[in-house]
Amino acid sequence: MRLALLVLATIGYAVADLFTSIADMQNLLETERNIPKILDKYIHDEEERLVQLKKLSEEYSKKNEISIENGLKDITNPINAFLLIKRKIFDWKEIESKMNANKAGNVVSSITDDSYGVRYPTADDLSGAAIGLLRLQDTYRLDTKDLADGKIYADQGNYTFSAKDCFEIARAAYNEHDFYHTVMWMEEAQRRLGDEVEPTVEVEDILEYLAFALYKQNNLKHALKLTEELYKMNPTHPRAKGNVKWYEDLLEQEGVRRSDMRKNLPPIQNRRPDSVLGNTERTMYEALCRNEVPVSQKDISRLYCYYKRDRPFLVYAPIKVEIKRFNPLAVLFKDVISDDEVAAIQELAKPKLARATVHDSVTGKLVTATYRISKSAWLKEWEGDVVETVNKRIGYMTNLEMETAEELQIANYGIGGHYDPHFDHAKKEESKSFESLGTGNRIATVLFYMSQPSHGGGTVFTEAKSTILPTKNDALFWYNLYKQGDGNPDTRHAACPVLVGIKWVSNKWIHEKGNEFRRPCGLKSSDYERFVGDLGYGPEPRNAPNVSPNLAKDVWETL
């Protein structure tokens, strides 16, 4: 998915959450094929209408020639006067009718009609897409000019941004009181405007927004300079003159003499807000998303892969396990969902996709949040054989009870789609979070990767300082609670924004009830699993004998 996001300029009337899901964007892309046919028909109808109007014009020209020749005789004759009035009433109605017979409204309705099964973007979708782009820029440290040129790392896209596109991104930031990005993108809009033969945006608009953003970023002299440029360009501008005086007064309050207000302009300062720079978790989260946090060789040397064969069925169909981290344990179950199963689950989920929600820590109710941008759907076991099969397989993978687990949740991430650092389990003070379920806290999480983005979209643990990049057909698993039942703070994790590509995941949250003997309580918080299903005794599976992977594959396909 490249930087074609500003195609979202079409304004519709739907709920503004199209940008939260690439699946909806794919549907929108499909409708582009219908537009040329609709426009061609509209052009044909308009050409016919214009031919009729031209004919009426020629008829009136002939009548006018006669009227000019006869002069006042026409209107002094009562019959002619009557006919003149009649023509003005009835003939003009015909002309007016043909002029108003423009079918543009019908064309727009047909393009945006819900009967196509596609919701068209709104102005809020455009804003959401722009904010998503800014999130990507920050997380992956992308250069503004490179992004505007359609370049992401070494990937050169098919589209570049105009000055207007950059202006709209900057304005979206401005509306969020994000003056850091406003400055960056207004400056880029200004640079691009200078290269445009046909300007796509008014320079006055850029100067006014940029001046105010520079002021908010502590660049008063630069704000004054740009506002004076605006005033010289348009002395009748409704705010320019007043803003010049306002900036002069502010500089005077800072002790700057009026004679020095336009001298010795310092370099422009444009720092990210202190609320971000001072947030150590945010800094760690972004570094982990860039996969820049090194793992010690000592820790790596302890990791290993093995075949999980601790259930009778698994003797014949062992599951490949890759340990990614100890304490808290996190593993990847390899190749545990097939492409066909992924496709089937996606088809079941697509009609049900809705803006993803989170549990309100006070009320326990589900609400949308800006820190979780994606769409999700819940699939019950009876909705498809594939759901029942996957649920049964999760039981073999984890050795945990599925009867009290939540339904299978499917998520699709949109432009800059992400989920900020959070816990899957409820903390002690969040006693109402899962009260309605009556199954206790979330003991563990299984996360299936159903696609593999080209860049971004990793799962990161901000306290454990580890990054797991998505690998299609694999499933990430970890325990959320200590064995004695308390929440493990080291399981705080996040979904990194998707930079390039599509991210589909499905997850299963497994609860405490029914797992009293499958995962017995430990005596202290330091008790933790060495491997999946570790009951505290027996050897590690590190040296377990391997089996033929083909045998496992054949057996699983019969399940």
UniProtKB/Swiss-Prot annotation:
Record Pfam families: 2OG-FeII_Oxy_3 (PF13640), P4Ha_N (PF08336), TPR_P4H (PF23558)
UniProt signal peptide: 1-16
Cofactor dependence: Fe(2+); L-ascorbate
Cofactor: binding details: Binds 1 Fe(2+) ion per subunit.
Keyword terms: Dioxygenase, Endoplasmic reticulum, Glycoprotein, Iron, Metal-binding, Oxidoreductase, Signal, Vitamin C
Residues holding 2-oxoglutarate: K503
Reactions catalysed according to its record: L-prolyl-[collagen] + 2-oxoglutarate + O2 = trans-4-hydroxy-L-prolyl-[collagen] + succinate + CO2
Domain Fe2OG dioxygenase: start-end pairs: 404-512
GO BP of this protein: collagen and cuticulin-based cuticle development; cuticle development involved in collagen and cuticulin-based cuticle molting cycle; embryo development ending in birth or egg hatching; embryonic body morphogenesis; IRE1-mediated unfolded protein response; macromolecule modification; positive regulation of multicellular organism growth
SUPFAM superfamilies referenced in this protein's UniProt entry, alphabetically: TPR-like
Glycosylated position list: N158
Disulfides per UniProt: none
One Gene Ontology CC term in the entry: endoplasmic reticulum
Major subcellular site: endoplasmic reticulum
The protein's Enzyme Commission number: 1.14.11.2
Localisation: Endoplasmic reticulum lumen
One of the record's GO molecular function terms: procollagen-proline 4-dioxygenase activity
InterPro entries given in the database record: Oxoglu/Fe-dep_dioxygenase_dom (IPR005123), P4HA-like (IPR045054), Pro_4_hyd_alph (IPR006620), Pro_4_hyd_alph_FE2OG_OXY (IPR044862), Pro_4_hyd_alph_N (IPR013547), TPR-like_helical_dom_sf (IPR011990)
Positions annotated to bind Fe cation: H422, D424, H493
EC primary class: oxidoreductase
Keyword Manganese attributed: no
Subunit structure: Heterotetramer of two alpha chains and two beta chains. Exists either as a phy-1(2)/pdi-2(2) tetramer or as a phy-1/phy-2/pdi-2(2) tetramer.
Role summary: Catalyzes the post-translational formation of 4-hydroxyproline in -Xaa-Pro-Gly- sequences in collagens and other proteins.
Family the UniProt entry places it in: Belongs to the P4HA family.
Name of protein: Prolyl 4-hydroxylase subunit alpha-1
Organism whose genome encodes this protein: Caenorhabditis elegans
Species lineage: Eukaryota, Metazoa, Ecdysozoa, Nematoda, Chromadorea
